[in-house]
Amino acid sequence: AGEDHGRGPYVQADLAYAYEHITRDYPDAAGANKGKISTVSDYFRNIRTHSIHPRVSVGYDFGGWRIAADYARYRKWHNNKYSVNIKELERKNNKTSGGDQLNIKYQKTEHQENGTFHAVSSLGLSTVYDFRVNDKFKPYIGVRVGYGHVRHGIDSTKKTKNTLTAYHGAGTKPTYYDDIDSGKNQKNTYRQNRSSRRLGFGAMAGVGIDVAPGLTLDAGYRYHYWGRLENTRFKTHEASLGVRYRF
């Protein structure tokens, strides 16, 4: 609100720091949905990340109560995972002219995952009440309904092959044979790209400080629950600093 306690339309621009948190919500192993296949990959379980993003709002100040529509875009989250698992399949002692030779056969499995998660945008409508402590200092609280758009994708490749290591005895270097059973090699590729739109709810609190007629400095916090994204739940905590101008 402006310094003159008047009413009128306003615009607001904020820079927000968002803490983004995804938690798992899998079907009960003994429940009715135990066989349900997840469409949000296990890759995205328990993500905790953050982003800095702009937010713009337009609203109307009724002289105590305010309503506003806001729009924000968030940063895309990237992560890569690579793992190798080596399992012994068999070992044999072979007699050679040079002595004993130990051959050990292994199965090598490589797993590469590349994932992205993007809270693309949030369009919200909020109702806010300003507490008029004095002519300059106005704490506020509010509630918000938001329509959020989230995209997530994963590109996973799993390769399995057999190798052989021959140990020739003490003091000699072992010999490594790569890909000894090419006919038994396996390569599994899994790609998933999803887009979800959900209606969520949140709350906000902060303080406005009038610095000039019609111009207010705003420092705020807001929590938003984006809704259930298949087998996960997504929420954000945001701290913001901005300016509001009432016409």
From Swiss-Prot:
Which segment of the chain is annotated as a signal peptide?
A: 1
Give the CC-aspect GO terms: cell outer membrane
Give compartment(s).
Answer: Cell outer membrane
Q: Which GO terms of the molecular function aspect are on file?
A: porin activity
What are the alphabetically sorted keywords of the record?
Cell outer membrane, Membrane, Signal, Transmembrane, Transmembrane beta strand
Keyword Endoplasmic reticulum found? no
Name the InterPro entries for this protein. Answer: OMP/PagP_b-brl, Porin_opacity
The Swiss-Prot or TrEMBL record describes its family as follows: Belongs to the opacity porin family.
Quote the function comment for this protein.
Implicated in a number of adherence functions. OPA proteins are implicated in pathogenesis and are subject to phase variation.
Protein name listed in UniProt = Opacity protein opA52
Q: Which organism is it from?
A: Neisseria gonorrhoeae
